[in-house]
A protein has these predicted regions:
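RNA/tRNA-interacting regions in translation and RNA-turnover enzymes
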Residues: 1-278
Length: 279
């Protein structure tokens, strides 16, 4: 490809990715699948390898989503909520495993929901925020209080500030009921459970969020070493002990063969789960 054509392609990819970021994270109205979006991001990284999430805050791939909607207070994340890297093929996975070396890995499914930050002060839930653009999100505390499974008080009083992160979702059965109700009322249907969860969590009226049967899975403790936790597997166990809902598919894999066995187990098995996964 000629240099001029490469520049034009890079510019088109930047604009297209930014447009889809806005559709997905701000308007909750995606036009393409996550897989197609990931391919656009991968192509941009290959054509413009200097662009990444850390070095170029103006690049669309330095952002997770779009600007927060007006109507909610803004929340600046102390540690940015960045998206995960992807492996599309067995070759991609093999390359990652070789780079990682001889280490045990905690494997788990990725929930197709809305990423949130939950803050506890002395063991009491005090604030919930959306990911937003990864650096600035929206304060949706009152809506998150309505979420099924959210512990308003932890089983153990942890002094000071504790931040955990997870996904808000609507389970498949609840999504079907919600769309059936909307159809009866002549309202537009949600495209998928993720869109329904995002739209519900960002309602200005908490009673609407409460009526949507939102669920929660938590998977991360920010600054986990402060709690004496040094592995993701330990983090998940501690989250359960503190009263958080954890999805429960995690498996500690000690060899590349065990990693592949986990992937094969859930390649089809994930479709039997009561919620949607996307990785």
């Amino acid at each position: 490809m000629a240099e001029d054509d490469i520049r034009k392609r890079i510019e088109w990819l930047r604009e297209e990715i930014s447009r889809h970021d806005h559709l997905y994270h701000v308007l909750d109205a995606p036009e393409i699948s996550d897989a197609k979006y990931d391919l656009l991001v991968r192509e941009l990284k290959e054509l413009a390898p200097g662009e990444d999430r850390e070095s170029d805050s103006g690049s669309p791939i330095s952002r997770v989503g779009g600007e927060p909607l007006k109507g909610f207070m803004r929340v600046v994340h102390d540690i940015p909520m960045l998206s995960l890297e992807n492996a599309f093929t067995g070759e991609d996975l093999g390359s990652f495993l070789r780079r990682a070396g001889d280490v045990a890995m905690c494997c788990e499914l990725k929930i197709d929901g809305l990423a949130v930050s939950l803050v506890y002060q002395d063991g009491i839930f005090s604030m919930g925020a959306t990911r937003g653009d990864g650096r600035v999100g929206e304060d949706v505390t009152q809506n998150i209080r309505t979420v099924s499974g959210l512990p308003l008080e932890l089983t153990e009083k942890i002094s000071g500030r504790l931040e955990v992160r997870g996904e808000i979702l609507i389970k498949s059965e609840d999504f079907a009921v919600l769309n059936a109700e909307r159809e009866d009322q002549g309202l537009p249907l949600f495209a998928n459970p993720r869109n329904a969860a995002a739209g519900s969590l960002r309602q200005l009226d908490p009673s609407i969020a409460a009526s949507r049967k939102l669920s929660l899975f938590v998977y991360q403790v920010v600054s986990s070493q402060a709690l004496g936790l040094y592995s993701h597997y330990e983090v998940l166990g501690r989250l359960k002990a503190l009263g958080f809902p954890v999805q429960g598919t995690e498996s500690l894999c000690r060899t590349p063969v065990e990693v592949m066995e986990f992937i094969e187990k859930w390649r089809i098995g994930r479709f039997a789960l009561p919620y949607v996964t996307d990785g």
